[in-house]
A protein has these predicted regions:
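Alpha-helical transmembrane segments and their immediate juxtamembrane cytosolic regions
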Residues: 2-360
Length: 360
């Protein structure tokens, strides 16, 4: 296991930061914003490009983020125990560190929304605020899981791997209630059950790392075959992200398919581990890893703010911000610009209001 001098697992740091950056780049590159009489409306090329949904099996990385987060929380708690820190203080410190910047950002945008609506009498400004803040939903789930950490740790000590089996079974039961018996409200229980399962799986990270390589390959193929079977059962959509216009999403709320995706991604990152650990030992890659870990969370928090600024400048300079539907060749060729533009607008926001931080 590749570690820094301080004992950190560099591959864990890489996975956690990379998962946030993948989310950011996906939002920048694959959001098609249309202006309607009611205000801005976002859609995606997934609804117009046949077969593109298969990419979401690799780039929907939230299961991996929660998995790595579970491992980090367990390791951090063990270090806190050695210092004599109580579980209440530990949980509160982590909630405060994550919630404070998110709440400040939300407050600023709500204030901007109220001011613009009052000054210019434009109701659409609230749609802008919702679009900018909507990616923060998963931080809310993450905060709930941190608050539930005492229960999760107790389950891990008391029941070990049975906790994962029970959570997986509960996620499947929720889908049965939802799709077989029509209890749509039950699906929202999976916001905690499915993401809680991913987080709980992270407690087994070191055991998974210690397994022989054939088990890594087994996890990868088990997850992949489960994904194929579930998607082609006709019950679940193929995309691992929401697609505008489809009546069912695997993400809102999450379905049992996300459990299969989690298994697939755990297997994949373990299969890639030897190569990536060798790469992360190189001085240049060490610097890259350190840099993205310092900036990943601020970049995630402010990336939609930067995108809003970039779109505002585009409207000011060119008089239009609407993306083409369906996306054509020109739209695809513009994707590098769609990434670089918001990035250049986000970096000053991070410099002014964000605080690059090291992963805890």
């Amino acid at each position: 296991m590749s570690q820094t001098v301080s004992g950190r697992d560099k591959y864990v740091d890489w996975l956690r930061a990379l998962s946030l950056i993948v989310v950011v780049v996906w939002h920048w590159a694959f959001t098609i914003l249309q202006w309607t009489p009611q205000g801005p409306s976002a859609t995606s090329p997934l609804g117009f490009t046949s077969g593109l949904w298969i990419l979401t099996w690799l780039f929907q990385v939230l299961p991996l983020f929660f998995y790595v987060g579970g491992h980090v929380h367990l390791m951090s708690w063990q270090r806190a125990c050695e210092r004599g820190v109580g579980i209440g203080a530990f949980v509160w410190r982590r909630i405060r560190a994550l919630a404070a910047p998110a709440l400040v950002l939300s407050g600023v945008w709500i204030g901007i929304g109220a001011a613009v609506t009052w000054a210019f009498d434009v109701a659409w400004m609230w749609r802008v605020v919702v679009l900018v803040l909507s990616p923060l939903w998963f931080l809310g789930v993450y905060l709930v899981l941190i608050a539930l950490l005492p229960i999760a740790l107790w389950m891990h000590r008391r029941f070990d791997v049975l906790a994962l089996i029970w959570l997986g079974g509960a996620a499947l039961v929720v889908d049965v209630l939802r799709f077989r018996y029509g209890f749509e409200w039950a699906g929202w229980l999976n916001m905690i059950i499915v993401w809680g399962l991913a987080h709980q799986s992270g407690f087994f990270y070191r055991r998974i790392v210690a397994l022989p390589r054939r088990y890594d390959v087994g996890l990868l193929w088990t997850g992949l075959f489960a994904l194929i079977g579930l998607v082609y059962s006709g019950i679940y959509p193929g995309s691992m992200v929401g697609v505008p216009g489809e009546k069912l999403s695997n993400m809102a709320p999450p379905t049992f398919v996300i459990v299969a995706l989690l298994v697939f991604q755990i297997g994949l990152v373990e299969v890639l581990r030897p190569s990536m650990e060798r790469l992360l030992e190189r001085p240049r890659w060490k610097r890259v890893n350190d840099t993205i870990n310092r900036f990943a969370l601020p970049l995630f928090l402010f990336h939609t703010t930067g995108m809003a600024i970039a779109l505002g400048l585009t409207w000011w300079l060119f008089g239009s911000i609407g993306g083409r539907i369906p996306p054509d060749l020109t739209w695809w060729l513009e994707r590098p610009i769609a990434i670089v533009g918001p990035l250049l607008c986000t970096l000053p926001v991070i410099y002014l209001f964000g605080r690059p931080r090291k992963a805890a």
